[in-house]
Amino acid sequence: MLNRRDFIRASLFGGVAAATLPSLLLQSYAQQAAIKTTTETVNSQVSLVTGSDRADMAFRTLQPFSREIAQAVGNKRIVLKPNFVSSSIQLSATHCDTMEGILEFFKSINKLDNVIIAESPADGPTIVAYDNYKFIPVAEKYKVSLVDLDETPIQLLYLIDEIDFRPKPVRVSSYLMDRNNYVVSVARMKTHDRIIATLSLKNIVVGAPIKDIGFVSGRNRPAGTRNDKPLVHGNGIRGINYNLFTSAYHLRPDLAFIDGYDGMQGNGPTGGTAVDSRVCLAGLDWLAVDRIGVELMGIDAATIGYMNFCADAGMGQFDINKIDVIGERVANHIKPYELPRTIERQLEWMTPLREPAAPPSSTPPQQPRANS
């Protein structure tokens, strides 16, 4: 196994981050035009499997899309984005066996020659998470690079803050914004303390903002270092739901994969407890995959703001009656997840901030009478 110094030298992609500031308005129009609106076309497909072996389940989940994935990848670089919201809590993070099954799948379709695994944990150095979760031997076995997104070139997104609604610049890794990369979200099935459920989209959107090199959360945080991920939260329930929605025009997976072998319920994304769901699901329409994910968790999809916003914008299929599930029947694997204790506050997005102002009166003001 590589030691940490050798690992950094041999595997992590470094480089000076170069911030770019394109015309976000024009870019947004272009991104919207590029998104295929599935709600007016054929049904979306989601693969659903069950089993007792993580790697085998991951491999079988992706098999129904072998031809489509191989064609879409072409000569693109494949970016596998695990979920390491914490560097030390395994239940909150993508399992190395799951990643091995996904790598084995790409090997089976002859697309393993240009694959990287790329992540930026929320709480500290990426190398610590790769080491703790035993990703280094997996990367060595399949001869793929482990990348620290905090050391990649950056672009800027502007997201809102509920406090003043002024756009805030957020540094995000260009690796996850570059449409010349084939981005795969390898997410865990978890509840969330702000947006009820965190699945394939959120793994990409909140994983993309970078941290300063050396940043760690808590009391040991070096002076002057910052982490841009909290900016996505928008200082409130309305802010985070809107930011996830608008970011999806720029940051979204080409292939969505959710590991529900054992999910997290309650106070996710790090403080919850395990649910023995024993499922994996995947598809090319990330919104359809996330929709089936919340169904399997027994969560009312109407309560999840950002997913409904994305559905209204035509980013994917959200109507469960228009999603064809390949493999297992969804109804046979629904396990209601305990919701976070903050659930009532999380529904604030469903009500307006204030009542709309009364329209101005159309009756002209009365002129004062002249004294007779």
Residue ranges and their predicted role:
Residues 1-372:
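N-terminal and secondary-structure boundary signal
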